[in-house]
Every structure is written in structure tokens, then in C-alpha cells.
Amino acid sequence: VKLNENPIFITQKRLVHRGGVLAAVLIAALIGLSLLAGLVAFRAVPADFRGFNSVQEAGKTFYAWTIAAEILVLVIGGFSRIFRTLAEERKAGLWDSNRLTPLQPAEIVSGYWLGPALREFYMALTLAGTGLVIVVLAELPVTLWLGTQWLIFSAALFFWLIAILAGLSFQRSQIGVLAVLIFVVVQPFSFVFPGFVLTNFLLPSYGIANLFQDPTSLAGNYSEHDWTQFPHFFSLPVPPILFSFALQMSLGILLWRGAMRKTANPFQPLILRSEALAMFGILLVAQHGLIWGLWQGKFPDLAISKHFVANNDMSSLLPVIHCGTFFMALLILAAASPQPETVRVKILRRKITTLGGIFSQSAVSLAMIMGAFASAVLFLHFARSITKSWEIYLIAAGNSVAVLLVFALLFEFCRLHHGRRAVGFLALWLFALCFLPFILAGVFRMGTFANVSLLAPGVTALNSSPIDNLNYLLGIVAAHFCLTLLLWIAWQREWRQLLAKASAS
């Protein structure tokens, strides 16, 4: 079925048009024309605009504001609109009604993917048109407009697909607004390390900023790495527009498969184990590939010029990436973790009643594999200096495995023991293990409390400044593994009780 014949898309289009699009388009036109008027005024009376040295510089500034508004409307506004539409229609039962029609899952998903955000799409087209006029009047290369629009619309499709999966996972539309707010607040912090943080390529801020630079500046060496240079993937320069597109495409295929599967059968997991590992692997390798050239396997000794080190503090980069790995892994684990009842039914159908069979299907085994893979990728930064920095690596790798195992065990334990109250008790446990030590450290002004946190040992060890208490951190990691063992025992007990009840019934 073509898109203009898709019943879901047609319905969403009618709803958008019924709500009115003219006012929204006029607002976008006023924004674009205001910026265009600024450029026209500069060309007429350059003396009134002392901040610009040339018409090209003025054009870049006004066009940058135009695409900033376009990103805000199309990517962030579209994400929120699709999420709220899908959550509300699931709550009203319309999603399930559409599933019972002869429509294929791909047709249903594409209708919700491209239909609800049409108002935002019209606004973005208006801004893109005025942006093209600005580029032409400022005598800028048209490739600037083509490249930035390509990046913006590809990012919009990628984030809209994430909105589909989020809408299939949560029925409260407020969660989408909260997710957008968190992303808007967190994203600017990645600008501190422009070419080294993956979020600058998922939302292609680096690629867009790079297109604004003079092409002749791209021939600079790696030591001058900033917004003007190509990112380096394992020390190989890669055009940022291609890097962003390849990253969005590879992840988008996995997200599309998840949306299709969840639409065909709502009892299927959002992400299969193989897809979870593939997604985690793509994100992890891409992120560590971007920063590998800083140390080139000789961590903590930087392998780049002293000029770069003097102007850029890299000591906190790997700890930040370490924490980001935790956040990314926990999200993927939560999405890929099957419900205990689903695992139990699958095991009973196969007539397997041992804990080994349950372990192979649970999130715990997935967490173990992900932790091992994260440790292997982290080893790339230590491969040539492992003899003198093995303690740092051991602490960071052990911390990665411990965090993922503790989360997976707690997640399933709370589901088994607390049922519908599982999320609240999981949040309580994570707060006590991860954040309470930092609060106690602030209250009592003792940094040792902070190191007890489940998140702290790896971050502290990976800080490039000299550390005298590595043995102490190794002891904390060992204590975390003892906690993991206790949770493992409790996890086994809960599963035995569930299997006993199933056998009795």
C-alpha cells in the first residue's frame, strides 16, 4: 500500500488538518522571514550590523538560527507529537483495533511514524524554504543547505522511530515530554567534547556545525580536533555526515524490526536478545572508536600533541563515557528483559525446569554478555599499556560487569517478588546503591562514602589524575561482586518458588 493510500496515515493526516495547520505554518513563516529580513537589512546597510564582517558571515548566522528552529520543531516537536498520539491511541484501544484489521504491521507502523507529525513537517518545510533563500542571498554554497537539510530530516526520521517504540512501551504521554526535557538538558554538555561524544552524531549537531566551516580548514591535523575537523574513527578521518547517517541507519533497522514485531504480537519483547547485543555493540564500538585516537591503547598517557592537551582537558572524557555506557546498557537491558511469566511459559513448554534453562533466557545472562563485551572494548584503550595500568583496567572492567549484573538481578528479583510494585522497589534499590553514597559524602564531607557507590569505582579509576588508593577501589569492586552473589541467591530462590507454584497448579 502506498503511503497516500495507507488508512492509518490518511486518518492521522485528517486529524492534523482538522486541528489546523495554517496558524502553525504562518508562525514558522514569520520566524523565517524575520531572519531573512535581518540578512536583507545587512546587505542594505552593513554599518548597522557591526558584529558581521561579510555577507557570508551574516548569512551563516541567520541560517544557523533558522535550522535551530527547524530542529526544535521537526525533531523534538515531532518526537513528542508521535509519542503522545501513539500513547493516547493505545490507551483508547484504537491501536489494538488497527491491529485486528487486514493491514500489515509495516503499514500500521509507517502510518503512525509519518502521520501524526505532519504539522511539524509543514512548519519545517517553511523554515527550510526561507533557509534556502537566506543561503542564496548570502552567496553561500547550496551544498550547505542540502547537507544540513539531509541531516535534519534523517535525524527526524530516526527520532520519530524511537518515539514509536517509546509509545509502544509507555501509555503515559507525560513520559514523552519528560524524555524530551531530559535530552534537551543533557545534550549541551556533549558540546564540551564536540567530536568525541556519540550524541553529537545521533542528533547530528557535529555534522551540521562542520558544514558551516571553511572546507580548507578540514586539512588540519588531528591535534587541532574541534568542530572544524572530521571525526576520527579509530584514528581514521570520517565525514561526519556519513558517520551520522550510517549510525542512524544501522540503529534504525533494529528499531524498525522491534516496532514491527511488537505490532504483530504485543506479547513479544520490544528488542530481541540478538538485537539488544547488536544495538549495544554498534553504540559501544562507535563511541569508543571516536575516542580511541586520544590514547591509542596507551591509557592514561595521551597520544596527541601537547598543544591539544593544553587547550582541552581530556581527563574527564573516559569517565563520562563509562557512565554513559551504564545508562545505555541499562536502557537496552530494560527493553530486552522478558517478563518472568513469559520466561516461565517458554521453559515449561520446552519441559525444562532447571535454573540453567531460566538463566539462558533471562536478562541476567544478557547482562553478563554485555558486561564482557564492554570490558573487551574498554581494553582497546589499555592494550599497549596494560603492564602499568592493569589495576585501572581491572577496576573499570569489573565495575562494568558488576553494575550490569546488579541491575539485571534486581530488575528480575523485583518483578518476581513485588509484582506490580516492581518499578518502585527497583528505583529504591538503585537510589540506595548508586546515589545515596554521594548524598552521605556531601552531608558528612567524606569522599570515601562516594566511592562506595555502585557507579563510583570505575569513574574514579579512569580519571587521568594519579590515584593512590587503587587497592581500596579494587576492594570496593570485590564488595560489589559479593552483593551480586547475594542477589544471585535471592534471584534463584524467587525462581524456584515460581516454578514450584507452577508445578503445583
Q: Which residues fall in each region the model found?
A:
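Hydrophobic alpha-helical transmembrane segments of membrane proteins
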Residues: 1-92, 112-505
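Short helix-to-coil transition segments within interhelical loops
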Residues: 97-106
